[in-house]
Curated annotation (Swiss-Prot):
Record CDD domains: ACCD
Keyword rRNA-binding (UniProt): no
Stated name of the protein: 1-aminocyclopropane-1-carboxylate deaminase
The family this protein is said to belong to: Belongs to the ACC deaminase/D-cysteine desulfhydrase family.
InterPro entries hit by this protein: ACCD_DCysDesulf (IPR027278), ACP_carboxylate_deaminase (IPR005965), ACP_carboxylate_deaminase_bac (IPR020601), TrpB-like_PALP (IPR001926), TrpB-like_PALP_sf (IPR036052)
Organism: Pseudomonas sp. (strain 6G5)
EC number: 3.5.99.7
Gene: acdS
Keywords, sorted A to Z: Genetically modified food, Hydrolase, Pyridoxal phosphate
GO annotation (BP), single: amine catabolic process
Function: Catalyzes a cyclopropane ring-opening reaction, the irreversible conversion of 1-aminocyclopropane-1-carboxylate (ACC) to ammonia and alpha-ketobutyrate. Allows growth on ACC as a nitrogen source.
Modified sites of kind N6-(pyridoxal phosphate)lysine: 51
């Protein structure tokens, strides 16, 4: 496998830390050891997160092409758009963000706090659009790019989750390589890796990266899209493409992609009671914050799998914390009493 053939523009502090979740592990019976790899604190750019790792492999292309404006898309509380705005500010580029109405939720300040607030503070041109949730290419995003061209700019397109970009999976191949090095330092290997999946490239990169040492099926995706067929197909497609890019040496098959669909309900962006319990439990036991859209659902999935005995006793499980805590502000009513 050859990831080093691709240029990387450093936007993170370096390898994200791995920390034990000792109190959560004990609370759940102590038979499974839980750890977290902290992508939520991987960068000094507006709280970082998993998209910042992905952008390290996209930005060299933007610079090489002489682009002056990063154009991206997401929901109103998109973590991706916040991270794109931060990177644009850091590089001295302009930023246009399309924020669609992906979530059927209306807190009084939903479109004024959290991720979207930070994007505005960082100087992004934020455009609200009424279109609903979809993980594909969107007309509103294409129009934003044509607007930049009409105004004499040169846009660089960054799709939702970076996932439709040819290099969208590379960052999390690097994640797997980091984990292998950290395992040498820790003196053990993780039996399972748990990760949230929606647009697909995070899990796709992990599948490829861990396929290099035979652990692709140990990457357990927790669907948060509530459109699992579309998400799984996208993970598989991106993983196959990424495997070719990094010269993995074998084909990625459907069996390599594990996606648990039990925890996404009722729909994208809306937490269920298990999501909220997981957010409160992890927060109160570990001081680690997760959000109602993504990480709260993957944390719920991991907690329930431990409770149900789905991880063999003695397993060491690595939770990929992808970030997203700024979105908590947009769900303040749900946590008005803690």
């Amino acid at each position: 496998m050859n990831l080093n053939r691709f240029e990387r523009y450093p936007l993170t502090f370096g390898p994200s830390p791995i920390t034990p979740l000792k109190r959560l592990s004990q609370h759940l019976g102590g038979k499974v050891e839980l750890y977290a790899k902290r992508e939520d604190c991987n960068s000094g750019l507006a709280f970082g997160g998993n998209k910042t790792r992905k952008l390290e492999y996209l930005i060299p292309e933007a610079i090489e092409q002489g682009c002056d404006t990063l154009v991206s898309i997401g929901g109103i509380q998109s973590n991706q758009t916040r991270q794109v705005a931060a990177v644009a500010a850091h590089l001295g580029m302009k930023c246009v963000l399309v924020q669609e109405n992906w979530v059927n939720y209306s807190d009084a300040v939903y479109d004024r706090v959290g991720n979207i607030e930070m994007s505005r503070i960082m100087g992004a041109d934020v455009r609200l659009d009424a279109a609903g949730f979809d993980i594909g290419i969107r007309p509103s995003w294409e129009k934003a790019m044509s607007d930049v061209v009409e105004q004499g700019g040169k846009p660089f397109p960054i799709p939702a989750g970076c996932s439709e970009h040819p290099y969208g999976g590379l960052g999390f191949v690097g994640f797997a390589e980091e984990v292998r090095q950290q395992e040498k330092e820790l003196g053990f290997k993780f039996d399972y890796i748990v990760v949230c999946s929606v647009t697909g490239s995070t899990q796709a990169g992990m599948v490829v990266g861990f396929a290099a040492d035979g652990r692709s099926k140990n990457v357990i995706g927790i669907d948060a899209s509530a459109k699992p067929e579309q998400t799984k197909a996208q993970i598989l497609r991106i993983a196959r493409h990424t495997a070719e890019l990094v010269e993995l040496g074998r084909e990625i098959t459907e069996e390599d992609v594990v996606l648990d669909t039990r925890f996404a309900y009722p729909e994208y962006g809306l937490p269920n009671e298990g999501t909220l319990e997981a957010i409160r439990l992890c927060g109160s036991l570990e001081g680690v914050l997760t959000d109602p859209v993504y990480e709260g659902k993957s944390m719920h999935g991991m907690i329930e799998m431990v409770r149900r005995g789905e991880f063999p006793e003695g397993s060491k499980v690595l939770y990929a914390h992808l970030g997203g805590a700024p979105a908590l502000n947009a769900y303040s009513f749900l946590f008005r009493n803690g």
